[in-house]
């Protein structure tokens, strides 16, 4: 006397076999390995921006030249990785929660609001910092989007006008690149 109908028993056995097969095929994947991404800017403003997961934050390493010396430049992740019309086709700041613009330490901000990068006397920005809002997987994933460098300083949403709450009054887009998976993820 069987406790389960034959058809149900067969389906249960098949389900268990599928689970075992899936477990064997994914056992070589290292899901705990941090994801890394890179954006390569080309043109008058050129260089690299690297993104690496570190615990609950993402480390952002900037190495960009061609900037105005001794000046802060707005620095944002924009929605689209589409650069068919230069930096203008990257759309608005990445803002999946529909919030107002702010600085990287603001409680209310776009996910893509990374504040400013500071150029040295030679027009170069080379340093690292961390952000806790951008991610390299999930809803706040920035891979496939664009990193954009602006001509002016981002006022971090404190400019007192509507444009400040939208863009930080950061001005013209002077450099951009699509953020893609870095080779460290694969080889």
Swiss-Prot record:
Binding-site residues for Cu cation, renumbered to this chain: 76, 78, 93, 150
InterPro entries tied to this protein: SOD-like_Cu/Zn_dom_sf, SOD_Cu/Zn_/chaperone, SOD_Cu/Zn_BS, SOD_Cu_Zn_dom
Coiled-coil parts of chain: none
Protein name, UniProt field: Superoxide dismutase [Cu-Zn]
Family matches, as Pfam families: Sod_Cu
Keyword presence, Disulfide bond: yes
UniProt superkingdom: Viruses
Catalytic activity: 2 superoxide + 2 H(+) = H2O2 + O2
Positions bound to Zn(2+): 93, 101, 110, 113
Record-annotated disulphide pairs: 87-176
GO MF term (any one): copper ion binding
């Amino acid at each position: 006397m069987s406790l389960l109908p034959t058809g149900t028993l067969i389906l249960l056995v098949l389900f268990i076999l599928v689970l075992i097969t899936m477990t064997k095929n994914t056992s070589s994947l290292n899901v705990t390995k941090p994801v890394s991404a890179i954006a390569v800017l080309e043109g008058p403003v050129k260089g690299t921006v690297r993104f690496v997961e570190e615990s609950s934050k993402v480390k952002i390493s900037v190495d960009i030249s061609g900037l105005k010396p001794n000046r802060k430049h707005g620095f944002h992740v924009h929605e689209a990785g589409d650069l068919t019309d230069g930096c203008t086709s990257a759309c608005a700041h990445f803002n999946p929660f529909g919030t107002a613009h702010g600085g990287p330490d603001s409680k209310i901000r776009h996910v893509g609001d990374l504040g400013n990068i500071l150029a040295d006397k030679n027009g170069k920005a080379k340093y690292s910092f961390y952000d806790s809002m951008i991610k390299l997987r999930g809803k706040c994933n920035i891979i496939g989007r664009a990193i954009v460098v602006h001509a002016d300083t981002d006022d971090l949403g404190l400019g007192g006008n509507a444009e400040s709450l939208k863009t930080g009054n950061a001005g013209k887009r002077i450099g951009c690149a699509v953020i893609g998976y870095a080779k460290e993820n694969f080889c």
